[in-house]
Amino acid sequence: MDDRKNILYLFDVDGTLTKPRQRISEDLKNFLLNEVKSRVNVGLVSGSDYSKIVEQMDGEETTNQFDHVFCENGVVHYQQGQLKKSESILTYIGEQTLQKVINFALGYMSKLELPAKRGNFVEFRSSMINICPVGRSCSQAERDQFSQFDMQHKIRANFVDALQNEFKDSKLSFALGGQISVDVFPTGWDKTYCLNHISKDSYNEIHFFGDKTTPGGNDYEIFNDDRTVGHTVTSPQDTKEQLKQYLNIL
């Protein structure tokens, strides 16, 4: 690997390397690890925790082949399979604020009329609170159904507005997370947080690939950060096609 360019390619997971909450295809996995990694350094950055990333990357062995794995926006950092850093939102904002956010979110969601509601509406992670109006235990069909409903009725966008208004004096940020949820995290703990683990001298360039790169999306900040070259993708297949073009892979 000594002949690799001193460049890091960072990839979002959902919508970029996989369909939302699904496994990476065998074709794209092999392409990344055999073709892309032989040319540049590769890393993952996701709002999900380590176990979910491992599931989507088709196992821990595959996950650990990436040079960097930034879980929960980089608040948890693995380098070549070794845990390097881990922090907690609870330590940062405290129990009182945490409960205020959760109580408000549950109250707001209780008034929503949706095509379906299931379970696991609030998920506590090291770096964030993940809030899901339909419930994370929904089936794939229910997930897709909510996603279509959300695009029409702006359920999550309105939810973000309500959270921002309620907690405007807090040091918290709110963003659309993946396909069905809202992420709540300390301001500055978006995906740009992962860049704090990469020294300025480590790479000549850092390229980021993501699908939620417009304002309000959870890729927006890192996509627009001065330290990265941002690339918007529309699907895992589009990611592959762009990589083939940038790296001259036939």
Range-by-range predicted roles:
Residues 2-5, 25, 185-250:
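Mg2+-dependent phosphoryl-transfer enzymes with acidic/Ser/Thr/Gly-rich catalytic loops
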Residues 3-10, 27-40, 166, 201, ...:
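A short, Lys/Arg-enriched amphipathic alpha-helix followed by its capping loop at the start of a domain
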Residues 4-23, 69, 195, 219:
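Asp-based phosphoryl-transfer active-site loop
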Residues 11-14, 72-74, 125, 132-136:
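Short loop/turn segments at strand-loop or loop-helix junctions that form parts
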Residues 18-22, 47-48, 184-186:
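Short, flexible loop segments at the rims of nucleotide/cofactor-binding pockets, characterized by
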Residues 23-120:
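Active-site phosphate-binding/coordination module
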Residues 37-41, 169-173, 203-204, 226-228:
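A generic structural motif
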Residues 115-207:
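Conserved acidic, metal-coordinating active-site core of Asp-based
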